[in-house]
Amino acid sequence: MQFTMLRYGFEDRPPRPIIQVVAKKILVVEDTKSIREIVAFMLRSKGYETVESGDGQDAEAKVRADPPDLIVLDAMLPRKTGFDVCQSLKGDEKFKKIPILMLTAITRDTGKSDEYWKEKSQADDFMSKPFKATELVERIERLLAK
């Protein structure tokens, strides 16, 4: 048995094809920098590519320029609210299928349920702050699997 290192590496057979895994891209939109960075870090540690934005207008521009696979979106944002961004994207044929998970403290402040705000915003899911990291990841994975 002869080993051909230049042609096949360390084996006497052709190499297996390389499988290229492309990470899902998630846009994290949150005006509180520390929360935005924590969520983005957590998602990167799970293998996702992240893009960050601190306001609604910038977030919508990023989606229109390079659509992500999913958006984690705060409701209360400067320049354009998360509700407005969500409704604008869901009303656009090109972007309406991008899953949006709204992550906000608004339910705590108003006393209304997550389901109420999910329906009002047109988001695919709605999660209240404070949140558990494991639950956030589970919901993101569920939305991406659809």
Feature-to-residue mapping (PLM):
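Alpha4 helix (beta4-alpha4-beta5 surface) of REC/receiver domains from two-component response regulators
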Residues: 84, 107-127, 134, 138-141
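Active-site beta3 strand of CheY-like receiver
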Residues: 67-72, 77
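Acidic catalytic/metal-coordinating carboxylates
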Residues: 55-58, 81-87
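The feature encodes the CheY-like receiver
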Residues: 36, 78, 96, 108, ...
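Short hydrophobic/Thr-rich beta-strand motif most characteristic of the beta2 strand and flanking loop
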Residues: 47-54, 62
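Conserved acidic carboxylate
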Residues: 30
